[in-house]
A protein has these predicted regions:
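ATPase catalytic-site recognition across NTP-hydrolyzing enzymes
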Residues: 77-145
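Acidic two-metal-ion nuclease catalytic site recognized across multiple nuclease folds
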Residues: 172, 283-295
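Mg2+-dependent endonuclease catalytic cores in nucleic-acid-processing enzymes, primarily RNase H-like
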Residues: 49-63, 69-71, 77-79, 88-92, ...
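Signature of the SF2 helicase/ATPase Hel1-core->accessory helical subdomain module
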Residues: 2-76
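Gly/Thr-rich phosphate-binding beta-strand-loop-beta motif of the actin/hexokinase/Hsp70
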Residues: 135-162, 279
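Conserved RecA-like P-loop NTPase helicase motor core
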Residues: 274-277
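Short, glycine/acidic-enriched loop or turn micro-motifs at the edges of active sites
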Residues: 9-10, 149, 174, 204
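Short catalytic-loop micro-motif centered on adjacent basic/acidic residues
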Residues: 41-45, 144, 196-201
């Protein structure tokens, strides 16, 4: 048996639309993948429009045994196959094509690859983290909450665990649900990991969120008001995030949504949502103030 998908996206607009991309990913995971039989080979074919498209997510999760990337023109600027299109014909196409479209449609470089800030994150799987944790107990946990204040924003939560002077991001929340859902969810996360302290950004809805959260958890909730420009804060914290933090890939939708939001963040500022990177920036600042010996 072989399961094949081919060009799930009509074009760049589909791949860069959160709504369309989520719908395609949901169809792939539920309708398509539910038809797999034991031992079924799986082949996904398509243009690499976005880091967050179906193929991009699967590559990040290391689902594929092998990935074959065919660029229209090689590093020497020659056609990959003169019988398909000659080098001169590709050169003419490149002149008439927007650079980001050329890179994605012809060179298989996702349009959101250029300008990625968090391009060197460190990951471990859930199983790998559990193996580490077997012989090395968690010494303490802190958390950070970036509260949604607009309809398109996400409430983002990250939990950081300290093991032998190493920082592991062990749990995540990334949701547009209302506070009647997100506050109990956050409280449950904090209690699950026995988080000692959690900062909540108090801008806008954050103050109300933190007060209600404190009534539902044993964790000490600390409000923080950020005055620094968000993008500046994210960029300034990025080195610490990449150098000092290891991200546990739990395999659930929340963690993958959070991680993909971080990976797709562009330092050039073309971001539909930057809630997860903003959450990590806040967590990074908090970690460095709490654990000066780890910084």
């Amino acid at each position: 048996n072989v399961a094949i998908t081919d060009d799930l996206y009509r074009g760049i607009e589909d791949a860069l639309s959160d709504t369309v991309n989520d719908r395609i990913n949901q169809w792939k995971e539920s309708t398509h993948d539910s038809r797999f039989e034991s031992g079924c080979a799986r082949i996904d074919i398509g243009t690499r429009w976005s880091l967050n498209d179906v193929i991009g997510r699967n590559m990040e999760s290391k689902i594929y045994d092998k990935s074959i990337i065919v660029s229209a023109m090689n590093e020497e600027g020659q056609s990959f196959c003169e019988d398909v299109l000659t080098t001169d014909e590709y050169i003419e196409k490149k002149k008439r094509t927007a650079p980001e479209i050329w890179e994605a449609e012809y060179q298989q470089q996702p349009v959101d690859m250029k300008g990625r800030l968090f391009n060197e994150l460190k990951f471990v799987s859930k199983d790998e983290f559990q193996e580490i944790n077997k012989t090395n107990p968690i010494e303490g946990c802190i958390g950070y909450v970036d509260v949604s204040d607009q309809g398109t924003d996400y409430t983002s939560v990250a939990i950081c665990a300290v093991i032998k002077k190493q920082l592991f991001i062990v749990d995540y929340l990334m949701t547009r649900d209302n506070t009647d859902i997100t506050i109990p969810q956050t409280a449950a996360m904090l209690d699950k990991w026995k988080v000692s302290y959690c900062r909540v950004e108090s801008n806008s809805m954050g103050a109300m969120f933190s007060r209600q959260l404190q009534t539902q958890t044993k964790t000490r909730i600390l409000q923080v008001h950020n005055t620094q420009n968000k993008i500046t804060r994210i960029i300034m914290s990025s080195a610490h995030v990449m150098n000092s933090m290891t991200f546990v890939r739990n395999g659930d939708n929340q963690s993958e949504l959070f991680i993909q939001n971080v990976l797709s963040f562009s330092k050039e500022g073309k971001n539909k949502n930057d809630d997860a990177p903003d959450c990590l920036a806040g967590l990074s600042i908090f970690v460095q103030s709490m654990f000066k010996n780890l910084s």
